[in-house]
Swiss-Prot record:
Signal peptide: none annotated. One of its GO terms (biological process) is ribosome disassembly. Catalyzes the GTP-dependent ribosomal translocation step during translation elongation. During this step, the ribosome changes from the pre-translocational (PRE) to the post-translocational (POST) state as the newly formed A-site-bound peptidyl-tRNA and P-site-bound deacylated tRNA move to the P and E sites, respectively. Catalyzes the coordinated movement of the two tRNA molecules, the mRNA and conformational changes in the ribosome. This is Elongation factor G. It comes from Erwinia tasmaniensis (strain DSM 17950 / CFBP 7177 / CIP 109463 / NCPPB 4357 / Et1/99). The gene is fusA. GO terms for cellular component: cytoplasm.
Length: 702
């Protein structure tokens, strides 16, 4: 089958924003104008096409980034049809992982800002992620019809808060209830959308007289910005020559692709104004797959030889799985982005990350939650495969005869864990199945069984993250669960060496007795090593060879639950150097018990301590809140390591015990009016101060 749309006419874009900037409404309008959607779904009615999970409709926030394909030929049908693949991304901080993964597979992004709220905290986080993946972007200032809307104020915030270089290509005509349309600063015309057909048609008009001067000023700003694209244009501009519309657009496009400027558009998605022109800007200024740098990877040749794949049908097939979703009708849907080559349904592909081949059964293109089955996908396409068994997020799919592993995505370690148990015994198996499914969909979510308590533990990126997962278990798998309090994983160890500690197990009660006797030395090992070492220094057969493994085993069993508070014991070395035995009464069991008695006695004498997990915490905050943030980290027993300037404020680096970090997201939000963001990851185990250790030991003893 030949390609229906040339790859130069593809646009793979994300629509990204803070929680209430009106991103879902904006996406809905895009689907409407591109002719995909015939009835406009309103978020307030819970009927928006993109927000297809039940919780999203209730909470009115977007959780899963749905990928949708649409076609656009321009507001005035001025282009050939372009294929626009849209990935809708969530705006809540606990779902940052979703934003991160969609940024990884996009070529460009539209940042939606609220004309009233401006650049809000999550906008800053999303901005940093887009910077990390060098995603070219344009901005859409939405909600121009709302009380307090101010387009130019938002433009200046993009400059001050995001340290970006915003270049408006439009101005708003009026604001609040007087918002009627926009001025196109390239054409220097006013655009007026017809309300009778929900803005499908429009007229170009003269710029209102009272805006003439302002429009001229911003037109000059735009032309100057375009002229900076090349020396040639700059000379022409400085020589007083007019730049043509085509020259301006070409130059601005070049600067967007180089991440030098952010073009800013505006409108009110709700009032059907502006989205149409923003779509034109997507086509005119955002990159096609052929405009972005080739994707890097490594060959599967044992030497990790670097390799690249270009956006070209002729190159070997290579794709990246960026999302797994469970569909009630077809099971697993694996969303993937094709970087190079062509693949047909029915083909076998290689997953080099898992060293497995899989057959691509059916391939579907998604329109929000509707599906269209297709026979093949080519470079630049975003589609979903049905029935891939072992693919997880971040895996590569490629041609089995040209194996390449594309750059993997990085997923943070979960930072909060809670115990969950099904409300009824009958749900136990269903819960295991549900948690397995959810963990496969979401790489930032982990599940394991606590060996001591037998409880199922789930861990994730934040409290809302875990709430939603528990909620999904109930809705999608009909499993109701009780959820425990967040927990910290402590450890126990010793600080001193003790010698010649005895352990004797002797029992005589008629018939055959039991006898085992060991003498050990015990001392600390360096952290980060094997965690446990056993040395057999028995000479002269004071303990027969066959009982030595039983001594080792007896000690290892004690390591699982330490004498202090029942937490695992780490970093100790045990030397067995003497003992005695009885020809008849000695047995493996007797020596195992003798060893455990010796261990307990030695552990108590060797200055036992409790270790707590310490996290590496980075807080990015506007400078005004710096003092509050540092004071708060100090109160949490944090050790400030350093500070540095960033484009949006300051970054504070600190080491903070995990037990002090519960509820931090909420506290940080209220301290900084939601303008700071933080990340944390596990750093090391360190000795807990006496008062903390005592409190933990007492709580465990209850």
């Amino acid at each position: 089958m030949a390609r229906t749309t040339p790859i130069t006419r593809y646009r793979n874009i994300g629509i990204s924003a803070h929680i209430d900037a009106g991103k879902t409404t904006t996406t809905e309008r895009i689907l409407f104008y591109t002719g995909v959607n015939h009835k406009i779904g309103e978020v307030h009615d819970g009927a928006a096409t993109m927000d297809w999970m039940a919780q999203e409709q209730e909470r009115g926030i977007t959780i899963t980034s749905a990928a949708t394909t649409a076609f656009w030929s321009g507001m005035a049908k001025q282009f050939e049809p372009h294929r626009v693949n849209i990935i809708d991304t969530p705006g809540h901080v606990d779902f940052t992982i979703e934003v991160e993964r969609s940024m990884r597979v996009l070529d460009g992004a539209v940042m939606v800002y609220c004309a009233v709220g401006g650049v809000q905290p999550q906008s800053e986080t999303v901005w940093r992620q887009a910077n990390k993946y060098k995603v070219p972007r344009i901005a859409f200032v939405n909600k121009m019809d709302r009380m307090g809307a101010n387009f130019l104020k938002v433009v200046s915030q993009i400059k001050s808060r995001l340290a970006a270089n915003p270049v408006p290509i439009q101005l708003a005509i009026g604001a609040e209830e007087k918002f009627t349309g926009v001025v196109d600063l390239v054409k220097m015309k006013a655009i007026n959308w017809n309300e009778a057909d929900a803005g499908v048609t429009f007229e170009y008009e003269e710029i209102p007289a009272d805006m003439q001067e302002l429009a001229e000023e911003w037109h000059q700003n735009l032309v100057e910005s375009a002229a900076e694209a090349s020396e040639e244009l700059m000379e022409k501009y400085l020589g007083g020559e007019e730049l043509t519309e085509e020259e301006i657009k070409k130059a601005l496009r070049q600067r967007v692709l180089n991440n030098e400027v952010i073009l800013v558009t505006c409108g009110s998605a709700f009032k059907n104004k502006g989205v149409q022109a923003m779509l034109d800007a997507v086509i005119e200024y955002l990159p096609a797959p052929t405009d972005v740098t080739a994707i890097n990877g490594i060959l599967d040749d044992g030497k990790d030889t670097p390799a690249v794949r270009h956006s070209d049908d002729k190159e070997p097939f290579a794709a990246l799985a960026f999302k797994i979703a469970t569909d009630p009708f077809v099971g697993n849907l694996t969303f993937f982005r094709v970087y190079s080559g062509v693949v047909n349904s029915g083909d076998t592909v290689m997953n080099p990350v898992k060293s497995q081949r899989e057959r691509l059964g059916r391939i579907v293109q998604m329109h929000a939650n509707k599906r269209e089955e297709i026979k093949e996908v080519r470079a630049g396409d975003i589609a979903a495969a049905i029935g891939l068994k072992d693919v997880t997020t971040g895996d590569t799919l490629c041609d089995p005869s040209n194996v390449i592993i594309l750059e993997r995505m990085e997923f943070p370690e979960p930072v909060i864990s809670v115990a969950v148990e099904p409300k009824t015994k009958a749900d136990q198996e269903k819960m295991g199945l549900a948690l397995g499914r959810l963990a496969k969909e979401d790489p930032s979510f982990r599940v394991w069984t606590d060996e001591e308590s037998g409880q199922t533990i789930i861990a994730g990126m934040g409290e809302l993250h875990l709430d939603i997962l528990v909620d999904r278990m109930k809705r999608e798998f009909n499993v109701e669960a009780n959820v425990g309090k967040p927990q910290v994983a402590y450890r126990e160890t010793i600080r001193e060496t003790v010698k010649d500690v005895e352990g004797k197990h002797a029992k005589q009660s008629g018939g055959r007795g039991q006898f085992g006797h060991v003498v050990i030395d015990m001392g600390p090992l360096e952290a980060g090593g094997p965690g446990y070492e056993f040395v057999n220094d028995i000479v002269g057969g004071s303990i027969p060879k066959e009982f030595i493994p039983a001594v080792d085993k007896g000690i290892q069993e004690q390591l699982k639950s330490g004498p202090l508070a029942g937490y695992p014991v780490v970093d100790i070395k045990v030397r067995l150097h003497y003992g005695s035995y009885h020809d008849v009464d000695s047995s493996e069991l007797a020596f195992k018990l003798a060893a455990s008695l010796a261990f307990k006695s030695a552990f108590g004498k060797a200055k036992p301590v409790l270790l707590e997990p310490v996290m590496k915490v980075e807080v990015e905050t506007p400078e005004d809140y710096m003092g509050d943030v540092i004071g708060d980290l100090n109160r949490r027993r944090g050790m400030i390591e350093g500070m540095e300037d960033t484009s949006t404020g300051k970054t504070v680096r600190a080491q903070v015990p995990l037990s002090e970090m519960f509820g931090y997201a909420t506290d940080l939000r209220s301290q900084t009016q939601g303008r700071a963001s933080y990340s944390m990851e596990f750093l090391k185990y360190a000795e807990a101060p006496n008062n903390v250790a005592q409190a933990v030991i007492e709580a465990r003893g209850k």
